[in-house]
């Protein structure tokens, strides 16, 4: 497929600065792009590469100026969003052929839409419901009475346990596990007694969950991933957690039981949250933060234990200077000790002088 820069700009609602007649055949990164390619610059720190790229066209912000005659710009509101739209044109998704493979196992009582695609090695349990346009790749397991909503995609080796509910247009990447038992144990004395986990996981529409992420079923009730949430790879979500609409959870985050996230919360990579917390709407938690208390709405916290982000920045700015500060402190301590000794010696001398005067006066 080839499209002119003018055609691309019209599609994106952008403005061409340069030669709009050049034909574009591919979309590539700014370092790899060559003649006939289009790339993008969404981060200001990469604007210097506009002079270096071999691309024929670059998606840029509205206020970016053309660096020279060698590259044509398409000015848009958001280059990254425009890139996403452009990729759907140059690299459209292939439509899966509907049907159930003879090598899939479907128990009696399962309901599967005729427009669903079920690959070899899929296991669908009794009472499960598979909606229209769903794609189940090899190795997927769908438990008893689980529901997979319309146009959802479950990549290889995804496991959806019994009675869990998956909404429409949900994407579960390879190895994701939905509905494994919550980590619920009572330990009277030194015994660990398992508490049955009889709740479910509910995943609402338009959620995407990364590879090898695990979401535990609730002890009672539901673990709930609300509409539009995006979860990265290797995330652990414990029993009865609620993640509010359009929140973003980055890789290796761990969320303990019964913690509730509000709307549009962002958790940075490797953040850890203890249980039974309330994280307010639009809050942001920095990478590797240890969250031990509630986080108010619209706040930004970082560090372990977490604290307001600005306080954490001030603390971190001191760390590189700690060795020098330690040497300075030791030097000051020695000076103070020396001054104290001199002061004591001075006092002794004064005492001796005073004693000598008294003796002279008594004579």
Swiss-Prot record:
Active site per the UniProt annotation: 239
UniProt keyword Lipid biosynthesis, yes or no: yes
One Pfam family matching this protein: Hexapep
Reaction(s) catalysed by this chain's protein: a UDP-3-O-[(3R)-3-hydroxyacyl]-alpha-D-glucosamine + a (3R)-hydroxyacyl-[ACP] = a UDP-2-N,3-O-bis[(3R)-3-hydroxyacyl]-alpha-D-glucosamine + holo-[ACP] + H(+)
This protein's pathway: Bacterial outer membrane biogenesis; LPS lipid A biosynthesis
Matches recorded under CDD domains: LbH_LpxD
Keyword Acyltransferase appears in the UniProt entry: yes
One example GO MF annotation: N-acyltransferase activity
Signal peptide (UniProt feature, chain positions): none
Region of interest (Disordered), residue spans: 342-363
Keywords: Acyltransferase, Lipid A biosynthesis, Lipid biosynthesis, Lipid metabolism, Repeat, Transferase
UniProt-listed SUPFAM superfamilies: Trimeric LpxA-like enzymes (SSF51161)
Source species, domain of life: Bacteria
EC number: 2.3.1.191
GO biological process annotation, one example: lipid A biosynthetic process
Gene Ontology annotations for the cellular component aspect, listed alphabetically: membrane
Enzyme class per UniProt: transferase
InterPro entries: Hexapep, Hexapep_transf_CS, LpxD, Trimer_LpxA-like_sf, UDP_GlcNAc_AcTrfase_non-rep
Family: Belongs to the transferase hexapeptide repeat family. LpxD subfamily.
Function: Catalyzes the N-acylation of UDP-3-O-acylglucosamine using 3-hydroxyacyl-ACP as the acyl donor. Is involved in the biosynthesis of lipid A, a phosphorylated glycolipid that anchors the lipopolysaccharide to the outer membrane of the cell.
Subunit organization: Homotrimer.
Protein name per Swiss-Prot or TrEMBL: UDP-3-O-acylglucosamine N-acyltransferase
Gene for this chain: lpxD
């Amino acid at each position: 497929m080839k499209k002119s820069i003018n055609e691309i700009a019209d599609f994106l609602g952008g403005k061409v600065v340069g030669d709009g007649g050049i034909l574009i055949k591919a979309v590539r990164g700014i370092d790899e792009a060559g003649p006939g390619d289009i790339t993008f610059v969404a981060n200001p720190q990469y604007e210097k590469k506009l002079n270096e790229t071999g691309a024929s066209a670059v998606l840029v912000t509205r206020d970016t100026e053309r660096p020279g005659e060698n590259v044509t710009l398409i000015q848009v509101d958001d280059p990254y969003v425009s890139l996403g739209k452009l990729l759907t044109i140059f690299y459209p998704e292939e439509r899966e052929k509907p049907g159930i493979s003879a090598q899939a196992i479907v128990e009696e009582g399962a309901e599967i839409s005729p427009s669903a695609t079920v690959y070899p090695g899929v296991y669908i349990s009794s009472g499960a419901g598979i909606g229209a346009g769903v794609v189940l790749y090899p190795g997927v397991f769908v438990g008893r009475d689980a529901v997979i909503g319309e146009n959802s995609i479950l990549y290889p080796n995804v496991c959806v346990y019994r009675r869990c509910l998956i909404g429409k247009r949900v994407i579960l990447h390879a190895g994701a596990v939905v509905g494994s038992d919550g980590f619920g144990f009572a330990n009277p004395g030194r015994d660990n007694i398992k508490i049955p986990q009889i709740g479910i996981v509910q995943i609402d529409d338009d959620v995407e969950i990364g590879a090898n992420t695990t979401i535990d079923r609730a002890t009672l009730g539901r673990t709930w991933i609300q509409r539009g949430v995006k979860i990265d790879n290797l995330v652990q979500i414990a029993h009865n957690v609620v993640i509010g609409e359009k929140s973003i959870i980055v890789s290796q985050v761990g969320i303990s039981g019964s913690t509730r996230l509000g709307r549009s919360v962002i958790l940075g990579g490797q953040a850890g949250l203890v249980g039974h917390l309330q994280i307010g709407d639009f809050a942001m938690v920095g990478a590797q933060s240890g969250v031990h208390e509630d986080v108010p709405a619209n706040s930004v916290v970082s560090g372990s234990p977490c604290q307001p982000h600005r306080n954490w920045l001030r603390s971190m700015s001191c760390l590189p200077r700690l060795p020098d500060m330690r040497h300075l402190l030791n030097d000051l301590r020695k000076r103070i000790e020396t001054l104290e000794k001199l002061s004591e010696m001075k006092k002794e001398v004064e005492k001796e002088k005073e004693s000598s005067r008294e003796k002279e006066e008594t004579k």
